[in-house]
UniProtKB/Swiss-Prot annotation:
Its EC number is 4.2.1.33. One of its GO terms (molecular function) is 3-isopropylmalate dehydratase activity. This is 3-isopropylmalate dehydratase small subunit. Gene3D superfamilies: Aconitase, domain 4 (3.20.19.10). It catalyses: (2R,3S)-3-isopropylmalate = (2S)-2-isopropylmalate. Pathway: Amino-acid biosynthesis; L-leucine biosynthesis; L-leucine from 3-methyl-2-oxobutanoate: step 2/4. The lineage of its organism: Bacteria, Pseudomonadati, Pseudomonadota, Gammaproteobacteria, Pasteurellales. It comes from Haemophilus influenzae (strain 86-028NP). GO terms for biological process: L-leucine biosynthetic process. The keyword GTP-binding does not apply.
Length: 200
C-alpha cells in the first residue's frame, strides 16, 4: 500500500450536516464484501433521479461538471453518523476521495476511514465555513493537503489539523494491520521457534 504524504486536489463542497452512512451508501448495495465497485453507488439516492442509477441528478453537487475528478470531500459536522457499515468509506475511496474535511466525524466512521487509508481532517466550524466560501468562489482550483506538516493550504491561507501520531505514521508509510504485523516478522518467527512442541 502506497504511503500518503501530500495531495493537491479538487474539492466537492457537500453543504450538509449529519450525513449518515445510509446516505453515503444505501443498504441495498451492501451485499458485496470486497472493497471495490461501491463508488458507482455513492450517495445513490441523492446522486440519481431513478432507482437504477442511470439518470444523474443535475442538482446534486457530485454531478456538477466543475467537481469531476475531485479527491477531497468537504462537509459539515457529524459526517458518517448512523450505522457502522464499513462500506461507507469503501464507497468514498472507490469513487476517488482520499481526504475528507469536516468539523466532526462519527467515531466509528472516522476510524473506518483511517483503516481504509483515507484521511479525515477535523477543522473548526469557522474554518470549514471559510473553505466552503473559497471553494464556491474558485471553481476548478485545487487545495493542498500535507500530512507531514499536518496542514491544509487553501488559496493563501494555511490551516493546521491534528492527527494521532500512530495513525499519522500508518498513513505516511502505507501500513494497514497486516503491514504493521509484518514489521515484527523477525520477532514473530523467533517466538514461534521457541514455542513448545505441544503448543504448535
Amino acid at each position: 500500500m502506497a504511503g500518503f504524504k501530500q495531495l493537491s486536489g479538487l474539492v466537492v463542497p457537500l453543504d450538509a450536516a449529519n450525513v449518515d452512512t445510509d446516505a453515503i451508501i444505501p443498504k441495498q448495495f451492501l451485499q458485496a464484501i470486497t472493497r471495490v465497485g461501491f463508488g458507482k453507488h455513492l450517495f445513490h439516492e441523492w446522486r440519481y433521479l431513478d432507482v437504477d442509477g442511470t439518470k444523474p441528478n443535475p442538482e446534486f453537487v457530485l454531478n456538477y461538471p466543475q467537481y469531476q475528478g475531485a479527491t477531497i470531500l468537504l462537509a459539515r459536522k457529524n459526517l458518517g453518523c448512523g450505522s457502522s457499515r464499513e462500506h461507507a468509506p469503501w464507497a468514498l475511496a472507490d469513487y476517488g476521495f482520499k481526504v475528507m474535511i469536516a468539523p466532526s466525524f462519527a467515531d466509528i466512521f472516522y476510524n473506518n476511514s483511517l483503516n481504509n487509508h483515507m484521511l479525515p481532517i477535523r477543522l473548526s466550524e469557522e474554518e470549514v465555513e471559510e473553505i466552503f466560501q473559497w471553494v464556491w468562489a474558485n471553481d476548478g482550483k485545487q487545495i493542498h493537503v500535507d500530512l507531514e506538516a499536518m496542514t491544509v493550504t487553501v488559496g493563501d491561507k494555511v490551516y493546521h489539523f491534528e492527527l494521532d501520531e500512530f495513525r499519522r505514521h500508518c498513513l505516511l508509510n502505507g501500513l494497514d494491520n497486516i503491514g504493521l504485523t509484518l514489521q515484527h516478522e523477525e520477532k514473530i518467527s523467533a517466538y514461534e521457534k521457541n514455542i513448545p512442541a505441544f503448543l504448535r
